[in-house]
Amino acid sequence: MATYYSNDFRSGLKIMLDGEPYAVESSEFVKPGKGQAFARVKLRRLLTGTRVEKTFKSTDSAEGADVVDMNLTYLYNDGEFWHFMNNETFEQLSADAKAIGDNAKWLLDQAECIVTLWNGQPISVTPPNFVELEIVDTDPGLKGDTAGTGGKPATLSTGAVVKVPLFVQIGEVIKVDTRSGEYVSRVK
């Protein structure tokens, strides 16, 4: 794998630190008036998704991580594992609850997901940026009820709970941003 010096760190770069893969989220190279230059780097730990901030000297280096992002189709959940298929080779991969995390509530059958593999094993699953889900439960919107400026909670077909505007009713399909978990619009 390639070696990267701290001044080469860019957003999206995947590196190895302490034997684990990390993704660089942002990097700021600082040259103080006195002393050695350094890089202030925000990293995301790929195994757990936690964010860390580290400082690297300009002479520090890190190995590139042997991490692969693949576009796979979500097939089904058997209760313990979530199964995905490569559309080109028809090879199937299984991801456990640790790799899926909170993204399980956004997975729909036949959805294209980005699965990150490390040493051939899935370590994270990223659902599509937007999904269209049906509302299965929400409070009825009363005519003239505009006292609150917010919205109301709605339970979606996958079990996710999203705050929606007062005019949205049970049975309607809505578009949700999976990155923030927020309502975007109604689907006609």
Curated annotation (Swiss-Prot):
Keyword field contains Cytoplasm: yes
PROSITE patterns from the UniProt entry: EFP
Post-translational modification: Is beta-lysylated on the epsilon-amino group of Lys-34 by the combined action of EpmA and EpmB, and then hydroxylated on the C5 position of the same residue by EpmC. Lysylation is critical for the stimulatory effect of EF-P on peptide-bond formation. The lysylation moiety would extend toward the peptidyltransferase center and stabilize the terminal 3-CCA end of the tRNA. The hydroxylation of the C5 position on Lys-34 would allow additional potential stabilizing hydrogen-bond interactions with the P-tRNA.
Main location: cytoplasm
Pfam families membership: EFP (PF01132), EFP_N (PF08207), Elong-fact-P_C (PF09285)
SUPFAM superfamilies in the cross-refs: Nucleic acid-binding proteins, Translation proteins SH3-like domain
Matches recorded under InterPro entries: Elong-fact-P_C, NA-bd_OB-fold, Rib_uL2_dom2, Transl_elong_fac_P/YeiP, Transl_elong_KOW-like, Transl_elong_P/YeiP_cen, Transl_elong_P/YeiP_CS, Transl_elongation_fac_P
Residues bearing PTM N6-(3,6-diaminohexanoyl)-5-hydroxylysine: K34
Gene Ontology biological-process annotations: peptide biosynthetic process
GO CC annotation: cytoplasm; cytosol
Pathway(s) the chain acts in: Protein biosynthesis; polypeptide chain elongation
Subcellular location: Cytoplasm
Keywords: Cytoplasm, Elongation factor, Hydroxylation, Protein biosynthesis
Consequence of gene loss (knockout): Cells lacking EF-P display highly pleiotropic phenotypes similar to those lacking EmpA or EmpB. They exhibit reduced growth rates, and they display increased susceptibility to hypoosmotic conditions, antibiotics, and detergents and enhanced resistance to the compound S-nitrosoglutathione. The susceptibility phenotypes are largely explained by the enhanced membrane permeability of the efp mutant. Analysis of the membrane proteomes of wild-type and efp mutant strains reveals few changes, including the prominent overexpression of a single porin, KdgM (STM1131), in the efp mutant outer membrane.
Gene Ontology molecular function, alphabetical: translation elongation factor activity
Functional description taken from the UniProt entry: Involved in peptide bond synthesis. Alleviates ribosome stalling that occurs when 3 or more consecutive Pro residues or the sequence PPG is present in a protein, possibly by augmenting the peptidyl transferase activity of the ribosome. Modification of Lys-34 is required for alleviation.
Family: Belongs to the elongation factor P family.
HAMAP family (alphabetical): EF_P
Protein name (database record): Elongation factor P
Phylogenetic placement of the source organism: Bacteria, Pseudomonadati, Pseudomonadota, Gammaproteobacteria, Enterobacterales
Name of the gene: efp
